[in-house]
Curated annotation (Swiss-Prot):
Organism: Pectobacterium carotovorum subsp. carotovorum (strain PC1)
Pathway the protein acts in: Amino-acid biosynthesis; L-isoleucine biosynthesis; L-isoleucine from 2-oxobutanoate: step 3/4; Amino-acid biosynthesis; L-valine biosynthesis; L-valine from pyruvate: step 3/4
Gene giving rise to this polypeptide: ilvD
InterPro entries: Dihydro-acid_dehy_C, DihydroxyA_deHydtase, DiOHA_6PGluconate_deHydtase_CS, ILV_EDD_C, ILV_EDD_N, IlvD/EDD_N
Protein name per Swiss-Prot or TrEMBL: Dihydroxy-acid dehydratase
Amino acids binding Mg(2+): D81, D123, K124, E491
Active site, UniProt feature: S517 (proton acceptor)
Cofactor names: [2Fe-2S] cluster; Mg(2+)
Keywords: 2Fe-2S, Amino-acid biosynthesis, Branched-chain amino acid biosynthesis, Iron, Iron-sulfur, Lyase, Magnesium, Metal-binding
Catalysed reactions, as listed in the record: (2R)-2,3-dihydroxy-3-methylbutanoate = 3-methyl-2-oxobutanoate + H2O; (2R,3R)-2,3-dihydroxy-3-methylpentanoate = (S)-3-methyl-2-oxopentanoate + H2O
GO BP term (any one): L-valine biosynthetic process
KW Flavoprotein (keyword) present: no
GO terms for MF: 2 iron, 2 sulfur cluster binding; dihydroxy-acid dehydratase activity; magnesium ion binding
Cofactor comment: Binds 1 [2Fe-2S] cluster per subunit. This cluster acts as a Lewis acid cofactor.
Length: 616
């Protein structure tokens, strides 16, 4: 029988000093012996997805205390990728994931907490907390801040839905007037919450549902809606029960590694492919799997990507649907229901509700449930009122979207395509693989061949695109932007956005060892592994080289014979200490980022730290 971790600091005469300090935080004799639950918050005024979280930690804590636990809250950092994007700030985004994971470990282990409620939302915060949860392997429930309402404005006598990416495209398009650009900017992000499309934040919050670590509705219920409050209340109550089941009943089934096992990781990836999630999710799932010692690799992702259809199309792949529309159609459970009916899911998995997948679908799938309260929850809709307040409105859709033929979520029979929304490509340009979000690729670009235009920084590529040096048919190659080479594996949303604004979104390809925002669409191929800084072939590409991309056949190739490629590799190695570094790039890199780069692995390993360099 495991004993409460917190007993280390609350029991025994030798812990008198620790108890004295606990008393100074408000604990009493009656609290020593109760489970101490860490409320891992991520409130910050820098990030719209987190600006409303200040009071939500207290909300969870009150429920923990009322349910027989002791709540202790702390905060992690949170970087806003959209604000950090397009300048040196983006170098810090991915490394912040490791800092978040480490900070959670540090706080929880230093104070011997027994369990956690993780209040996350945006791009690197959910992955960082997920990595920490699987590393620590103590009971945990995730509850995120929720998605933002989609922006809306009237253009050309039509009301259209908007998001952050629309503001970026309009701002870079010289054909758009200043007045229209400002109108879109002011309308694109109307409320608190994670950006309204199927970008990285929302993708990851959906995947925590599929992993079994969060409650139904977590990924899609709007941040502003009053119904979302119940998720926080339930999390506070339920985590105490999970802690007691483990520590008092020796029930290991409630531990995150037993919930988020190999089968659950496969289900999460199947969901990701079906909903055309952000390519960043691949990076984060691989990293989380390593923390949980789950044998889940790029090989598994490649296998699944060939089996799963594309069942849910959401911005940025279409302007028609945003997360509020996914929720109306049944949210994550609605997509999982269609995948289950297609025979694609592992059914022998459990979740923090204590339910199996079939039990969860029966209770929460809008196509199956008879529970009016569940149907009411999925009818929660937007209010269209600018606000930074959580739970501030109670608007509802007139009806649910249960049209599986032409609605937001489709059945397998009526899938957007029988090929899923993500694919892994292999070839001499990416021997360990690279990732493309096929959900955002125009059908006419699935097979593409063109000359390379090579840039050794995102900044140089942006200047070339906006300067008219990139033309239709080109393959833009941006290298030395991987985890080690950047360092920090910047997102390339600005280059892809500017290709669109210059009218090249469907006539050019972009390949990088960096990564893409969840807001990216078009023929954008990232995570090329090995990266340039690790000796990857992408470092050897020269201007004018022909690159061949064949998504249906999952291949990507530098059209160059082996002898020529070997000659280039030898020439690069001959550079000595300068080998596998940019030839002509000026970039100031801080000590903190250099420390990150010294241990970083390529994207096919999740860009985690290389434990072998630490002797572990």
């Amino acid at each position: 029988m495991p004993k409460y971790r917190s007993a280390t600091t609350t029991h025994g005469r030798n812990m008198a000093g620790a108890r004295a300090l606990w008393r100074a935080t408000g604990m009493t004799d009656n609290d020593f012996g109760k489970p101490i639950i860490a409320v891992v918050n991520s409130f910050t005024q820098f990030v719209p997805g987190h600006v409303h979280l200040r009071d939500l930690g207290k909300l969870v804590a009150e429920q923990i205390e009322a349910s027989g636990g002791v709540a202790k809250e702390f905060n992690t950092i949170a970087v806003d990728d959209g604000i950090a994007m397009g300048h040196g700030g983006m170098l810090y985004s991915l490394p912040s994931r490791e800092l978040i994971a480490d900070s959670v470990e540090y706080m929880v282990n230093a104070h011997c907490a027994d369990a956690m409620v993780c209040i996350s939302n945006c791009d690197k915060i959910t992955p960082g907390m997920l990595m920490a949860s699987l590393r620590l392997n103590i009971p945990v429930i995730f509850v995120s801040g929720g998605p933002m309402e989609a922006g809306k404005t009237k253009l050309s006598d039509q009301i259209i839905k908007l998001d952050l990416v629309d503001a970026m495209i309009q701002g870079a398009d010289p054909k758009v007037s200043d007045e229209q650009s400002e109108q879109v900017e002011r309308s694109a992000c109307p409320t608190c919450g994670s950006c309204s499309g199927m970008f990285t934040a929302n993708s990851m919050n959906c995947l925590t549902e599929a992993l079994g670590l969060s409650q139904p509705g977590n990924g899609s219920l709007l941040a502003t809606h009053a119904d979302r409050k119940q998720l926080f209340l339930n999390a506070g109550k339920r985590i105490v029960g999970l802690a007691k089941r483990y520590y008092e009943q020796d029930d290991e089934s409630v531990l995150p590694r037993n919930i988020a096992n190999k089968a659950a990781f496969e289900n999460a990836m199947i969901l990701d492919i079906a909903m055309g999630g952000s390519t960043n999710t691949v990076l984060h799932l691989l990293a989380a799997a390593q923390e949980g010692e789950v044998d889940f690799t790029m090989t598994d992702i490649d296998r699944l990507s060939r089996q799963v259809p594309h069942l849910c199309k959401v911005a940025p792949s279409t302007q028609k649907y945003h997360m509020e529309d996914v929720h109306r159609a049944g949210g994550v459970i609605g997509i999982l229901g269609e995948l289950d009916r297609a025979g694609l899911l592992n059914r022998e998995v459990n979740n923090v509700l204590g339910k199996t997948l079939p039990e969860t679908l029966e209770a929460y799938d809008v196509m199956l449930t008879q529970d009016d309260s569940v149907k009411s929850m999925y009818s929660a809709g937007p209010a269209g009122i600018r606000t930074t307040q959580a739970f501030s409105q109670d608007c509802r859709w007139d009806s649910l979207d249960t049209d599986r033929q032409e609605g937001c979520i489709r059945s397998r029979e009526f899938a957007y395509s029988q090929d899923g929304g993500l694919a892994v490509l292999y070839g001499n340009l990416a021997e360990n693989g690279c990732i493309v979000k096929t959900a955002g690729v125009d059908e006419g670009s699935l097979v593409f061949r063109g000359p390379a235009k090579v840039y050794e920084s995102q900044d140089d590529a942006v200047d070339a695109i906006l300067g008219g040096k990139v033309v239709a048919g080109d393959v833009v190659v941006i290298r030395y932007e991987g985890p080690k080479g950047g360092p920090g594996m910047q997102e390339m949303l600005y280059p892809t956005t500017y290709l669109k604004s210059m009218g090249l979104g469907k006539s050019c390809a972009l390949i990088t060892d960096g990564r893409f925002s969840g807001g990216t669409s078009g023929l954008s191929i990232g995570h090329a592994s090995p990266e340039a800084a690790s000796g990857g072939t992408i470092a050897l590409v020269q201007d004018g080289d022909i690159i061949a991309i064949d998504i249906p056949n999952r291949s990507i190739a530098l059209v160059l014979d082996d002898n020529a490629l070997a000659s280039r590799r030898a020439a690069e190695e001959a550079r000595g200490d300068q080998a596998w570094t940019p030839h002509n790039r000026e970039r100031q890199v801080s000590f903190a980022l250099r420390a990150y780069a010294s241990l970083a692995t390529s994207a096919d390993k999740g860009a985690v730290r290389d434990k072998s360099k630490l002797g572990g």
